[in-house]
Each structure stands twice: as C-alpha cells, then as structure tokens.
Design a protein with these regions (language model features):
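A short, Lys/Arg-rich alpha-helix, primarily the initiator
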Residues: 1-9, 47-48
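Short alpha-helical DNA-recognition segment
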Residues: 11-29
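Recognition helix of helix-turn-helix/homeodomain-like DNA-binding domains
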Residues: 23-37, 68
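DNA major-groove recognition helix of helix-turn-helix/homeodomain DNA-binding modules
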Residues: 40-59
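Short gly/ser-rich loop at a beta-strand->alpha-helix junction or flexible surface loop bordering the NTP-binding
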Residues: 56-153, 162, 169-197, 208, ...
C-alpha cells in the first residue's frame, strides 16, 4: 500500500487524512516517510476503506441535460416513487443498484420530489448514456445491497455513508427525512444505524436535525 499516493488521490493533506480516518497526525507522517510501518491487518483495512471512498467520491459534478443522451421516465408522470423506479429499471434493462435518494425511496423512508431528475446508481459507466444518471461506483459489496419489489438498492447504513462521502453535491433533505422516519418508527431510537468513525461527528449533527425534522 502506497499511503502517500492513495492520500493524494483523495485530495487530502496529511492533517485532513489523519482526521478523516481517526489516525494520529504523527503516525501518518511516520508511515509515509517509512520511519514506521502500519501492522499488516491495519494496512489492509485502511486500504480497503480508502479505495471504497475513492469509488464513492468519484462524482464531483452533477450532470446537465444532454440532448444526445437517452431520456429516462420522468418522475411527474408517475403517482408513486416505486412505480417511477420500476419504470427506470425496465428502460435500463441491465444490472445496477439504486443508491442515495433512490435507495431511500426503495426502503420506503423518503417520498422523493415530483421534479426528481438525478438518479443515483452503482453500475457500469455505460449507464451514463442516460440523462440524469449519476454512477457512484462500478462495484458494491453484496452485503450492502437489498432487494424488494424487484428493485436492488443500497441498505440504510451504506446509503448513509454514501451521503456523507458525497455531501458536497448532495441535497440532504432525503437522508434527513429518512433518518427521521427511521427514528420515530423505531421507538425514538437510531439502534441499528452505524457509520464509519470519520463520519460519526457529522452523523450526530444530522441525527439532531432528523429528530427535529417533523417538528419544524
């Protein structure tokens, strides 16, 4: 594992890297200079998490409408979110996994918007031939994927982590509403919800917003 190269790909300083992965700053310096080496199990785990973050953060700009691309069914033509997502699945007709807001719709935790345009997915880059599609990554662990109503989508914890990783381009209304519904349907508890350590502080702020969501 070339830590310096992976850190550079993330676009992080040593300090930013240390804070993101909850590693002492001096330790990061020592690992990069070769003064010390991380234990093998830790190196493997860290590399796995970094590469996942690189996949999740591959999208930095939302796509604009391109008349040369194919159009997907529009949300306003369907009464419910699920019927819209099924129509999208039928048009794409290849293997993919719904992510972020669309995953929350599949989970029944977010109703979506009537003017919805962006569709977040995991799958082949070839899916970008459709207007509105944003490919978060080409691969995702089957342990993070659920299936219901003939739709495949990321589970809540993966959806939450993806939201944190893509915060700079994501409207947080969906994940905030979803967490609020989860909280109040589980006896005012977030039991079962978990995030990586680097997202814990951000999650706690988001959880506060979620508990107040329907009272505002």
């Amino acid at each position: 594992m070339d830590l310096r190269e992976l850190r550079a790909q993330l676009g992080l300083t040593q300090q930013g890297f240390a804070e993101r992965y909850d590693i002492p700053f001096r330790t990061v310096q020592n690992w990069e200079t070769g003064l010390r080496r991380p234990p093998e199990y830790m190196a493997r785990l860290l590399e796995y998490r970094i590469r996942n973050d690189l996949i999740n953060c591959k999208t930095t700009v939302l796509p604009e409408y391109d008349p040369r691309k194919m159009d997907l069914p529009t949300r306003r033509d369907y009464v419910g979110a699920l019927s819209w997502l099924k129509a999208i699945r039928n048009v794409i007709s290849e293997d993919f996994v719904f992510a972020l807001d669309e995953a929350l719709m599949c989970q029944g935790l977010f109703g979506g918007r009537n003017d919805e345009y962006i569709v977040w997915v995991y799958g082949s880059d070839a899916l970008s031939r459709f207007n509105g599609i944003v490919v978060l990554g080409n691969r995702i662990s089957r342990y993070c994927v659920q299936e219901k109503n003939g739709l495949r989508f990321t589970d809540l914890n993966r959806t939450l982590s993806d939201s944190m990783a893509n915060e700079s381009i994501l409207d947080f209304q969906g994940i905030t509403e979803a967490l609020s519904r989860y909280y109040y349907s589980n006896n005012e508890s977030f039991l079962g919800v978990s995030v990586a350590p680097e997202y814990q502080e951000r999650f706690e702020r988001l959880a506060d917003d979620a508990t107040d969501y329907y009272s505002n």
